[in-house]
Amino acid sequence: MRPALRQRMQIVTKCGIKLVSPQRPGHAIKSYDTSAAHVRASVEASLRALRTDHIDLLLIHRPDALMDPRELAEVCAQLRTEGKVAHVGVSNHMPSQLALLHQHVPVVTNQIELSPLCLNALSDGTLD
């Protein structure tokens, strides 16, 4: 990517879901994974695919019931120190999940699913 073009962009990408596809033969089932190894591998893959040296906002996509907030905080801090990730956010977390994670990771945003076709966030506690 040309540096002049990159400077005019904010790159936001997600990690934390192992999708099933022909490009991912090691993923037998769709699952969530916020382990340090998976987050780091996802960031490195995004950097290569996007041909950039850093991500402006990394979103942890969907809550992971097996998440270790301290492990996630450590890898996020390392990625920030390395200059690979500027900010960390989450996607589709309930307020209690966001509060737990925020104790360990400086989360800057929570992207929620809300559209004319999906109004659940207005009544399911997401906006509490």
Please state what every model-predicted region is.
Residues Q7, A41, L50-D53, G83, ...:
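Structured loop/turn residues at beta-strand edges in well-structured enzyme cores
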Residues M1-K14, D53:
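N-terminal binding-site loop/beta-alpha segment at the start of enzyme catalytic domains
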Residues R24-R40, H61, L66-M67:
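Active-site mouth loops of central-metabolism enzymes
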Residues V12-K30, H54, L59:
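N-terminal small/glycine-rich loop or linker at the start of catalytic domains
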